[in-house]
């Protein structure tokens, strides 16, 4: 319970605390636009990272959809430090487009939880994912040179974003062929998300799982992740190498853990 209270505090801080960095740290490959999200009855600010050679090339690119865009590219907009996604991808010369979706501030918990929690509420991730799949992705595929097939489409996030990214692979397996699941907050919908996975018959998604062993006062983050991986492996041979799991010694529930783990995840997922 103490762990859950600490995590919920972090979740709320994501939505309410502003960073006072004086200058933007986003690279010139990053741009933004706003799009209506009728499923959520709001508008969403979208961040777009394009590879360094995008403008000089005619090739098509795989796409990664990521949550909490405020924390991905720019220290000025982040809660407690950015992921440095743009700088890391530039250094790798990664041939991938990243689409960051800003969280809904005080609606973050609501948008990034598949089911309503009796204590904390939420439960509108289905609407949020419908926005991504039916409104945002078509816009991205029309505007940019993308490889739109599921094998070239990844979804990635941390904490509630990790939970919703996993849920997305069960809800839309025909859309998302890969996922980066960092410190997933399975606990907030534990009963429902495990039941959903148990009912799932086939699973071909490629998963990269990451969490730290010091994310709370108990080991529920690690045990939940181990349990979920076990359930997945009961439906396919581990020899297929479709999932990778990293438990970081001393890793805590914060941007540093996710920032430090991003490159290894990207490389393992094929970028």
Which role fits each region the language model picked out?
Residues 1-25:
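Bacterial Sec-dependent N-terminal signal peptides
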Residues 22-271:
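Non-catalytic cap/lid and distal C-terminal segments of serine-dependent acyl enzymes
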